[in-house]
Curated annotation (Swiss-Prot):
Enzyme class of the recorded protein, top EC level: translocase
Record's catalysed reaction(s): a quinone + NADH + 5 H(+)(in) = a quinol + NAD(+) + 4 H(+)(out)
Organism per entry: Pseudomonas putida (strain ATCC 47054 / DSM 6125 / CFBP 8728 / NCIMB 11950 / KT2440)
Major localization class: membrane
Keyword Cell division: no
Listed name of the protein: NADH-quinone oxidoreductase subunit C/D
Region called NADH dehydrogenase I subunit C, residue ranges: 1-184
Family membership: In the N-terminal section; belongs to the complex I 30 kDa subunit family.
Lineage, uppermost ranks: Bacteria, Pseudomonadati, Pseudomonadota, Gammaproteobacteria, Pseudomonadales
NCBIfam families: NuoC_fam (TIGR01961), NuoD (TIGR01962), PRK06075.1 (NF004739), PRK11742.1 (NF008728)
Length: 593
């Protein structure tokens, strides 16, 4: 599928300084403090008094920064390596993305502990709503003018702000937990939905509205996810998504794990993405360390990542068709996923959560016979996809339930931070593997599937076509696998290559320290985004020169995708909501982290 794209996307330009010149011309060079990082984008500190004006300028400039890609905070109080930066107890960063420039810029603002407040930017980017709520939830930073500043990850009754450095990171640091009857009643009452708190009316002109909880254990919610629906009959007047039931504190865990030992935790973010979760993390760490991996490592990583793109999309396809009424295909897609997992397990030793990528390489070399397994799979799957297209995707029931349902355009997608198939289904040709190649994707031939209606059916079809392109990429990996090592020869490669430990005592000591304590990364900041199974996934890492991350920010695609739901589904039927939820393709671990 192809579509005419109204937005021309130029070649990627890392550290694009054009926007810095524009900002200096508009506000003066004295308005900003530039920070040198390894993020691949300009990072500028601005005074709080000018923050909103600067952000509004970037939103309205020629070739605008239409997407607020991310917004979060950092507790700076224990950070020791801050030379040249404005004094700050806390900081908040705004990561902006321009499709038309194909470049990013990060704006930071410093805050003192006794004055933790900022103006809301929900009037500039609507998706700032959830991000500002999360910053308040995690750090206690207030956003003046926010329409509903409340807990989003933690329960309403929670005390404290978990991502502060003085907040305990382990259960053993808390008092023993007990649930009294009074506390149980308090928790139950706090979960009761109050329409007035969200600006909703209980009655219309001639009718009473019904409020319905869809979830948090509804099968069509695809996880612990609750949506409170305001209904007039079966028509959705309004709705409020409620997340956080699956929150496990992944970003807090990263502060207590070594750079190496956090890798298995990345697998559990999008738990259907496998090594796709490892990739942005290890790439970001390798930027910090200055590691350039061998070409063979790049090709192996791409091959395994595309295998997991296929397994994730197969699960989406089967469960989505089941959501709209066809029960049989899900059994076939699960069987077909098993064939892919057979290959994955033979190469990595694990199925869903291999935790197989390493800082500087992969866990081990490809096993004997891997090529035959991969060859058999790439020859078999295209015919299988043809069968799915004919038997399921051309089915009149699926088309009737999804064509024209939950449609949105490119402008709306960018305003809400939508990426991946949900963005490309609107006709926007933005795939990081093409627009900003990483790990050697520029060496592969493949197409970016597009659609143009932006509805539930198009989102489904884009993912099916993506599986065909993944097969093309895997086939090229098979035919062009380089010779060479599976780890970089670098002091911070972890675990280090073991051969030298058998010859030199110094390398044996280094090996022991890096495996037991973890590598010491240079003090700096790095960032890496990738085209994951559900959209753009990224890691923003802050190192203070130690064996653990000072701050790890995990930006996932499913989080903004769920925030977009009310703007898309108002005025539709409840049955259309089910079709819409399935077409998003999300898992709650990817939302809640």
């Amino acid at each position: 599928m192809t579509a005419d794209n109204a937005i021309f996307i130029p070649p990627y330009k890392a550290d694009d300084q054009d926007v810095v010149v524009e900002l200096n011309n508009r506000f003066g060079a004295d308005a900003f403090v530039a920070q040198e990082t390894r993020t691949g984008m300009p990072v500028l500190w601005v005074k709080r008094a000018q923050l909103k004006e600067v952000l509004s300028f970037l939103r309205g400039v020629a070739k605008p920064y239409s997407m607020l890609y991310d917004l979060h905070g950092v507790d700076e109080r224990l950070r020791t390596q801050r030379r040249g930066l404005p004094a700050a107890d806390f900081s908040v960063f705004y990561h902006l993305l321009s499709i038309e420039r194909n470049s990013d810029v990060m704006i930071k603002v410093s805050l003192s502990e006794g004055d933790l407040n900022l103006p809301t930017v929900t009037g500039i980017w609507p998706n700032a709503n959830w991000y500002e709520r999360e910053v308040w939830d995690m750090f206690g930073i207030d956003f003046a003018g926010h329409p509903h500043l409340s807990r989003i990850m933690m329960p309403p009754t929670w005390e404290g702000h978990p991502l502060r450095k003085d907040y305990p990171a382990r259960a053993t640091e808390f008092d023993p937990y007990s649930l009294t009857l009074a506390k149980q009643q308090l928790e139950e009452e706090s979960a009761r939905f109050n329409p007035e708190a969200w600006g909703m009316k209980r009655q219309g002109a001639n009718e009473d509205y019904m409020f319905l909880n869809l979830g948090p254990n509804h099968p069509s919610a695809h996880g612990a996810f609750r949506i409170v629906l305001q209904l007039d009959g079966e028509e959705i007047v309004d709705c409020v998504p409620d997340i956080g039931y699956h929150h496990r504190g992944a970003e807090k865990m990263a502060e207590r794990q070594s750079w190496h030992s956090f890798i298995p935790y990345t697998d559990r973010i999008d738990y259907l993405g496998g090594v796709m979760n490892n990739l942005p993390y290890v790439l970001a760490v390798e930027k910090l360390a200055g590691i350039k991996v061998p070409q063979k490592v790049d090709v192996i990583r791409i091959m395994l990542a595309e295998f997991f793109r296929i397994t994730s999309h197969l699960l989406f396809l089967g469960t989505y068709i089941q959501d709209v009424g066809a029960m049989t295909p899900v059994f076939f897609t699960f069987t077909d996923r098993q064939r892919a997992y057979t290959v994955i397990e033979a190469i990595t030793g694990f199925r869903l959560h291999p935790a197989w990528y390493r800082i500087g390489g992969v866990a081990h070399d490809l096993p004997r016979g891997w090529d035959k397994l991969v060859k058999d799979f790439v020859e078999w799957l295209p015919k299988r996809l043809d069968e799915y297209t004919k038997a399921a995707l051309q089915n009149s029931i699926l088309k009737g339930r999804t064509i024209g349902v939950a449609a949105y355009n490119t402008k709306e997608a960018l305003e809400w931070g939508t990426t991946g198939a949900g963005l490309r289904a609107t006709g926007c040709n933005f795939d990081l593997r093409k627009a900003r190649p990483y790990s050697g994707y520029e060496n592969f031939e493949f197409e970016v599937p597009l659609a143009h209606n932006g509805d539930a059916y198009d989102r489904c079809m884009v993912r099916v076509e993506e599986m065909r392109q993944s097969i093309r990429i895997i086939d090229q990996c098979l035919r062009n696998m380089p010779e060479g090592p599976y780890k970089a020869d670098h002091p911070l490669t972890t675990p280090p290559p073991k051969e030298r430990t058998l010859q030199h005592i110094e390398t044996l000591i280094t090996h022991f320290l890096q495996v037991s304590w973890g590598p010491v990364m240079p003090a700096n900041e790095s960032f890496q985004m990738i085209e994951a199974t559900k959209g753009i996934n990224s890691y923003y890492l802050t190192s203070d020169g130690g064996t653990m991350s000072y701050r790890t920010r995990i930006r996932t695609p499913s989080y903004p995708h769920l925030q977009q739901i009310p703007s898309v589904i108002k005025g539709s039927m409840v049955a259309d909501l089910i079709a819409y939820l399935g077409s998003i393709d999300f898992v709650m671990a990817d939302v809640d982290r």
